[in-house]
From Swiss-Prot:
Residues 169-182 have a biased composition (Basic and acidic residues). This is Probable U2 small nuclear ribonucleoprotein A'. Keywords: Leucine-rich repeat, Nucleus, Repeat, Ribonucleoprotein, RNA-binding. Transmembrane segments: none annotated.
Length: 253
């Protein structure tokens, strides 16, 4: 078990990434708990905690600068109620391959008024009835969900499904649902992120190079998530970003 200590923060790579954001790389350290983040003094736009053993998305100090969190391949099944207060400018939350199980588990994100991009690919929540519709209804500022742009017709359908008296029963049932299973008992599901061939070493190197040359945050997010999933999307990893609506317009204001 590796603790998030002052020494670890100092040792890990810190750099300005391809889209001119200051980033710290905390990947692959077997970190179980988010802690001691205050020592970074809110100096980063991006914190990358991919490939760790984190179970709870909590314990952040107030960070006004941080806007992007990469948490691919962890065991997260809990999002703290105060996340919006602690991270008021959070724009991108990437949670590919975690253990978010119930629609009710995303309730804290509804208070994140600047959240525009989320991915829950590889989480049990994606198999829930009306998953995408509820995400659209509950997170009105989000413009891209799982690399698919939210369309106006979807927003209207989501409102019709969940708004007002007719949607109250469905809302109440969802808001009462929270995940209670101990994530330590859950083994990662190799098929949870969908079909597709496994990435080859050559694919991985090409994707890493593409990340370095990315022109937008949405492109970085898309490529990072493919690396995290370890699989080639059906349309290929190097497809144009606007095919699924994850283009710069969808992400950047």
């Amino acid at each position: 078990m590796v603790r998030l200590t002052t020494e670890l923060f100092a040792e890990r790579p810190q750099f300005v990434n391809s889209v001119n954001m200051r980033e710290i790389n905390l990947r692959g350290q077997k970190i179980p708990v988010i802690e001691n983040m205050g020592v970074t003094r809110d100096q980063f736009d991006v914190i990358d905690l991919t490939d760790n053993d984190i179970r709870k998305l909590d314990n952040f100090p107030t960070f006004s600068r941080l806007n992007t969190l990469y948490l691919h391949n962890n065991r997260i099944n809990y999002i703290a109620p105060d996340i919006a207060t602690k991270l008021p400018n959070l724009k991108t939350l990437a949670l590919t391959n975690n253990n978010i199980c119930e629609l009710g588990d995303i309730e804290p994100l509804a208070e994140c008024k600047k959240l525009e991009y989320v991915t829950f690919i590889g989480n049990p929540i994606t198999h829930k009835d009306n998953y995408r519709m509820y995400m659209i209804y509950k997170l009105p500022t989000v413009r891209v969900i799982d690399f698919n742009r939210v369309r106006l017709t979807e927003r209207e359908a989501a409102k019709k499904m969940f708004k007002g008296k007719s949607g109250k029963k469905a809302r109440d049932a969802i808001q009462k649902s929270v995940h209670t299973e101990d994530p330590s008992e859950i083994e990662p599901n190799e098929n949870s992120s969908g079909g597709g061939a496994r990435l080859t070493d050559e694919d991985r190197e090409k994707i890493k190079e593409a990340i370095k040359n990315a022109k937008s945050l949405s492109e970085v997010n898309y490529l990072q998530s493919i690396l995290a999933s370890g699989k080639v999307p059906e349309k290929g990893w190097n497809r144009q970003m606007d095919q699924n609506g994850a283009d710069g317009e969808a992400m950047e204001s």
